Amino acid sequence: MRALVLLLSLFLLGGQAQHVSDWTYSEGALDEAHWPQHYPACGGQRQSPINLQRTKVRYNPSLKGLNMTGYETQAGEFPMVNNGHTVQISLPSTMRMTVADGTVYIAQQMHFHWGGASSEISGSEHTVDGIRHVIEIHIVHYNSKYKSYDIAQDAPDGLAVLAAFVEVKNYPENTYYSNFISHLANIKYPGQRTTLTGLDVQDMLPRNLQHYYTYHGSLTTPPCTENVHWFVLADFVKLSRTQVWKLENSLLDHRNKTIHNDYRRTQPLNHRVVESNFPNQEYTLGSEFQFYLHKIEEILDYLRRALN
């Protein structure tokens, strides 16, 4: 009888633990508004994501560009999983990022945030001047001074995230994403795994990897630990509309619903300083000139891809 009671207690405790860990963005008792009740750091003063208001970003010419090694084509097998919230790819420890202060970070995993619910197609976590972009890519790293990610994730200087926005227009297919997107069909349900053979993260990122915004914040999902050095790239990844649609509509969550709008709302800046290593050209050159310059760049980029 005592053994039966013990088993029942363990079952109930396990069910409670599973419920507590099953956070969501917009549904149930553990939606985004209730994260701080179970994960106190989510109610902290240095939370992410934030709105990057360019007129208030401080240009710091002493900030060097990011030095990335191992981001180019790598042979091997790379696990890819539907974790119920997004798609996540495990990355090799040979991928490293050295930042302006000399700290070396080791890549751990990459994942995506997107929109797609009803008429809302934009799903980036960070916004720029209040504008939410279509998708946001996160490459999570840990400080190489620590032996593992598990140790670093609790350290005050433990983590760094490289973020990039995705832009969608009438672009042709971005073939650097073709293999990744084709594998989404293999992980429709939470917990399902597949394997990518060969991976080139550098080609999945924007062409310009040197211009970025940076600030100190947190993980954007529970436990929302405030130990993340953020690097948000200024340039964009370009995907076709079909590719974006497939990413937004291929995976199901733990409630058997399509994963849509898997992003956290922007958090208060709370007197933090956001820096960039490039001047804000929109305001130094004039907004109208910058608008037409951007349009010309888009047309040239489209023609280059069409001719290849």
Curated annotation (Swiss-Prot):
Cofactor(s) the protein needs: Zn(2+)
Keyword presence, Zinc: yes
One GO MF term attached to the UniProt entry: zinc ion binding
Positions glycosylated per UniProt: 67, 256
Residues annotated as binding Zn(2+): 111, 113, 138
Pfam families named among the record's database cross-references: Carb_anhydrase (PF00194)
Biological-process GO terms, alphabetical: detection of chemical stimulus involved in sensory perception of bitter taste
EC annotation from Swiss-Prot or TrEMBL: 4.2.1.1
Enzyme active site: 85
Keyword Disulfide bond tagged: yes
Domain of life: Eukaryota
Intrachain disulfide bonds: 42-224
Compartments where located: Secreted
Function: Reversible hydration of carbon dioxide. Its role in saliva is unknown.
PANTHER family, alphabetized: CARBONIC ANHYDRASE (PTHR18952), CARBONIC ANHYDRASE 6 (PTHR18952:SF110)
Name of this protein: Carbonic anhydrase 6
Originating gene: CA6
